[in-house]
Every structure is written in C-alpha cells, then in structure tokens.
C-alpha cells in the first residue's frame, strides 16, 4: 500500500470527505472487493456506462468511504481478469478492478483506442485551443457538477479544472508526508504558506475530475473539456524537481508555462547584443526578426537584444520541459488524442504592460523553437476581482495585442480575469472574436461563501460563521503587523469593507478599536477582508487564524478540509447555482454562447429547488 493511502486510513480520512488527496480513488481494495463479491449495497453510478473493445464498463462506489471500482461486463463470456491490475472475477462473469491511478492510466488507453473522440478524459481539441473559460479549483472539488451542468446546457467545452502546480496542489505526496514541501510567499499575510495549500494532489485532482464526469453522465454529451496545469514553473529552484512535476501533470491536457522562476535569477549582460551573438543561434535570431517583421512590427534593435538576453535562458528550459511533457505522454499513452496537449505562454510576469512587440518576439521565439502556442497571456494591468475602469482604453490595449496574436494563430489569455464587468468581458469577446481564455479561479471561494451565507442549514451556518471569524482575526492581526506590506494590505481590506458600508475608516488607534469597527458590520461574503483571506481556511489546522496553522498537511488540516465536504445539499445547490450562473454570464458576455441559450440556462437554474434536479440536467 502506498504511503499516502496508509496515512489516510490510519487517520480515518476517507475519500468521501477528503477526495483527491491520494492519487487513487480506492484506499482499501480488499474490503471493497469483498463487499461487491458478497452483494453488499454498493452504489452503481447509472450514467457512468462506457464501452471499450473489451466490453461495457460501469463505475461502482462505496458511498460511505468514497472507494470506487470499475466493473467490466462482457456479452456472452467472461471478462479478462488481467486487463487492469488487481482484477477479481465475479460469479456473474463480470470483473471488478480498483480505481487506482495506475488503472486509470491504462483505462485511458483502452477508451481512446476504442473511441479517439471520447470525452471522458480531458482533451486538447482545436476548439479548446481557441476559446475557453478557465475554472479554477482554488480550494475544493465541489465545483465540478456545476461546471458540468454549465457545459452541458451551453453546449460548449471549457477548462473544467485549473490549478497552479505546485502552488495550489501537492505535486508529490511522499514529499508532503516527509514534511519537505517548499513554501510559497504570500506578502499580504506576511508569511510563507506550504505548497499545495488546497490539500489535494495533482494526480488526485486529475483522477477525480474524470470520475465526476462519469458520475454525472457528462461524458454522454460528447463535449470535449480540458484540464489546465496552470503556472508550471520553469527554471530557478524548480530545476531539481521538474521530472516530478512532469509526472504529476501527465493527465493535464493544457500546460501554462510560467518563466518567472528563471527570469528572477537572470541578469542581462551590459552588452546584450554581444551576449546574444555569442549565445543564441544566429539563424534563430534572423528567423525571429523576419517573423516579427512579417507580423507588421518594427523592432528597436537595442530593446530586442535586451529582451532576448533576458528570456533566452528561460526559453531553453521551457523547450526542454516541453520535450519532457511530450515524452511522458508518449511513454504512457497509445493514441494521438491521448498524447496531445495545449500550450499557454504566460508573459504577464515580464515588467510593465506588455507591448505588441514583446508579444510578437515571444511568439516568434516559441514558433522558431517548434512550440505551438495556443494561448498567450500579456499583462493588461488587471487587478484580481476588480473591473477594468476604462473600456475604451481596454479595447485599445486588446486590439494591439490581438493584431499580433491573430497573425500567429494564438488566442489571448486573460489572467486575473475574474470579477470584471459585463462591459469588460464584452470588449474582450468582441475584439478577439471569442478567441480567448479567461482565468477565473479567484471567484469560486467567494461563491461558496455566498452559498453558505444563504443556506438555512445549521451546520452550513456554523461553518460560515467560523469561516468569517477566521478572516476577521487575520485582518486584525495583519492590521497591526510589523511587516509593512501585511499591515498596509490588511488595512486596505478593512477600510474598503467599512467605507462600502458607510462607516468611518479611522479605526486603527488600537486592535480593540479595529475589532469594534469590524464587529459593527453584519457578516457578509462581500467584505473585502473576507474575500482576500478566505481561501486559507480550508487547510488551516483546527480552523485557527494563525500563520503556523495555514496550509497544514497533517490530520488536523485534513479534518478541517472535511468540513467543507460535509456541507448540506442545500449548500451544494446554492454553490452549484452560483457557479453556473457566473459561467453563463461569462459565456454570454464574451460571445462564447448565444444569448438565447444563456437565457434558457438561467431560467432552468432559477427553477431548481433541490440538488438532484440540477444534477439530472447534466447527462444526455
């Protein structure tokens, strides 16, 4: 048994209330196998059926534990017991297999060899490489049914799971158990938080999002969807573990390359042109210059040399990493569909607003290196969860970038894309003709807060109160921190909430005064301090608002995480409706779905009185 499965079982942490921590979706195969063999009550997911050359498959689950199994039925004969690992024959002639990650990888080949157009697994279809909405899973997996509903009703595929790895997801559970995860700086809270601060592993998320499509029957719609391994760090301190990152992300159908770790340690030579002449192939330089000129841009030679000297080391490492992603897929998967993946180049980490010339140079470099870029993410000056204040200026910025991207056959990735105005999204969609990606991961913890706040369920209300108090405590601690950045940001968060409620903002004479001012407000998910600190609650040991408790990968952290998976059906329905409503809003305003289709979807959402009714709208 793997170390992570042993850890989970020893501490009574089951998949039902802590999914996606282990790469496997079966922790105790012997018990599940015996239960199935002895005809004990095991749930058969009715919409999960799919076919391979070997026969017909169904997904089974012990809903008390969350342990899952595959059942293979063969018409008129016995199913092969060794098709996947650890198979067991039933008296009926069917065979069952544990839902391990290794079996999932083998099953992907069987499915795609039989039907290359299958939409059970994330894919890299041409349409997904042109237009998508990025749905981030910043703290739980509870958003999946809502995303599946929205895709089903709108008839479009999106990036149905998006996570920064290793920032948000655990890239290696053995490293986690050894207490050796690196940490991520969060300047606004004045501390570093361990990587994987959501608690789940990248393989677990990859596994879980596939099973979700089968449980709800979304795969019967035949709509392709993608999984984005976001902000894959290139170079710097990540060189030593890039092989582990590649292995963990093998089911991702969409990779975002983040050059910032290598850029942070790159010093540009005083004579950049001479450095480029000595270190960059002359033929490549000539190719890039010609390609940029073909796109209608004139380069400043000095600026070109400085940029090339700055980015060349990171691009060489990006090329090597890209080769590893391709090799890992070629080794494991047998079909072109199973091996394909999309690429996004994140250049919003480069200094300042991105110029069209910079975008053209970066795209030309990737093109010359044989890396097709499907999405490129320039810097537009967006702030997370805040509308862009000037639509005329925004249109001008996007038009300049789109002229370049269109020439290179790339779409624009809008990072920090959540919380913009309808007019902002309309501009994005109109200028690009829908050739865009909007990343919205900052939105979904907020929607969970709204869901719990509105729920009448006592347990949901208790979780909401604890969650809100957690953010209050962090805000007060931060407002009096010795760290200047932490103090500044905390006070901004507090005064924003107070001013929007018509209260005075001169409240920092003492912690007592600040607490009194905050406590005069009615608890609300609309307060900025709640919005900014909320994602840290999910893995805070004991739910404590203490820096040492954040991102806790011990049983205490995972027991806290289980509270979110225990919310009521009312809370889940509220959450699903909130998410689906937001996705419909995005799809309509960007032009990815017709207004009439979106209006029909909104009417359906408004009519749902229970979670089962919404879930029933997913399968064909």
Locations of regions flagged by a protein language model:
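Conserved, mostly hydrophobic/aromatic
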Residues: 230, 345, 415
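Short, charged/polar micro-motifs that form catalytic or ligand-binding hotspots
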Residues: 134-138, 297, 301-312, 349-352, ...
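Active-site capping/gating regions of soluble enzymes
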Residues: 1-213, 217-220, 224, 237-261, ...
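Short, conserved phosphate-binding/catalytic loop or strand-edge motifs used
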Residues: 337-343
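Aromatic- and acidic-residue-enriched carbohydrate-binding clefts of CAZyme catalytic domains
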Residues: 181, 271-305, 379-381
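Active-site beta->alpha loop and helix N-cap motifs at the rims of alpha/beta catalytic domains
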Residues: 196-211, 225, 231-239, 285-297, ...
């Amino acid at each position: 048994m793997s170390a992570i499965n042993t850890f989970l079982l020893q501490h009574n942490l089951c998949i039902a209330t802590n999914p996606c921590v282990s790469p496997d979706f079966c922790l105790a195969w012997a018990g599940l196998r015996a239960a199935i063999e002895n005809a004990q009550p095991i749930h058969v997911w009715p919409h999960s059926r799919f076919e391979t050359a070997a026969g017909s498959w169904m997904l089974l689950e012990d809903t008390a534990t969350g342990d899952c199994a595959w059942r293979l039925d063969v018409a008129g004969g016995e199913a092969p017991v060794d098709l996947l690992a650890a198979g067991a024959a039933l008296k009926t002639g069917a065979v069952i297999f544990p839902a391990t990650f290794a079996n999932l990888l083998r099953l992907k080949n069987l499915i795609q060899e039989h039907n290359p157009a299958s939409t059970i697994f994330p894919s890299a279809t041409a349409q997904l490489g042109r237009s998508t909405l990025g749905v981030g899973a910043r703290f739980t997996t509870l958003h999946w049914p809502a995303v599946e509903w929205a895709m089903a009703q709108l008839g479009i595929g999106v990036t149905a799971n998006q996570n920064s790895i290793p920032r948000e997801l655990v890239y290696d559970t053995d490293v986690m158990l050894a207490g050796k995860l690196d940490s991520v700086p969060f300047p606004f809270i004045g501390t570093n938080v361990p990587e994987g601060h959501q608690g789940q592993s990248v393989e677990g998320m990859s596994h879980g999002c596939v099973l979700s499509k089968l449980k709800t029957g979304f795969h019967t719609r035949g709509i392709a969807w993608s999984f984005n391994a976001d902000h894959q760090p290139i170079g710097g301190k990540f060189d030593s573990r890039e092989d582990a990152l590649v292995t963990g992300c093998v089911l991702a159908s969409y990779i975002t390359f983040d050059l910032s770790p290598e850029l942070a340690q790159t010093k540009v030579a005083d004579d950049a042109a001479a450095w480029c002449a000595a270190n960059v192939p002359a033929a490549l330089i000539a190719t890039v210059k010609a390609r940029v000129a073909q796109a209608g841009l004139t380069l400043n030679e000095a600026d070109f040399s400085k940029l090339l000297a700055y980015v060349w080391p990171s691009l060489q490492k990006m090329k090597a990493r890209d080769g590893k992603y391709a090799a890992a897929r070629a080794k494991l998967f047998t079909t072109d569909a199973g091996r394909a993946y999309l690429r996004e180049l994140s250049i919003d980490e480069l200094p300042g607003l991105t110029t069209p010339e910079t975008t053209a140079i970066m795209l030309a470099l990737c093109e010359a290196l044989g890396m097709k870029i499907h999405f490129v993410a320039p810097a537009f000056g967006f702030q997370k969860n805040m509308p862009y204040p000037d639509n005329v200026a925004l249109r001008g910025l996007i038009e300049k970038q789109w002229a370049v991207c269109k020439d290179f056959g790339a779409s624009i990735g809008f990072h920090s894309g959540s919380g913009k105005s309808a007019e902002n999204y309309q501009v994005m969609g109109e200028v690009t003709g829908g050739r865009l990606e909007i990343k919205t991961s900052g939105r979904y913890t907020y929607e969970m807060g709204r869901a719990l706040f509105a729920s009448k369920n006592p347990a949901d209300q208790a979780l909401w109160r604890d969650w809100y108090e957690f953010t209050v405590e962090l805000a007060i601690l931060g407002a009096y921190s010795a760290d200047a950045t932490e103090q500044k940001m905390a006070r901004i968060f507090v005064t924003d909430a107070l001013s929007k409620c018509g209260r005075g903002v001169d409240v920092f004479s003492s912690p007592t005064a600040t607490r009194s001012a905050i406590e005069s407000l009615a608890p609300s998910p609309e307060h900025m301090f709640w919005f900014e600190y909320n994602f840290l609650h999910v893995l805070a040991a004991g739910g404590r608002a203490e820096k040492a408790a954040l991102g806790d990968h011990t049983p205490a952290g995972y027991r806290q995480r289980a509270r979110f998976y225990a919310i009521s059906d009312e809370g889940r329905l509220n959450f699903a409706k909130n998410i689906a409503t937001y996705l419909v809003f995005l799809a309509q305003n960007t032009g990815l779905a017709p207004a009439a289709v979106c209006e029909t979807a909104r009417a359906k959402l408004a009519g749902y009185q229970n979670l089962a009714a919404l879930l029933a709208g997913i399968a064909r």
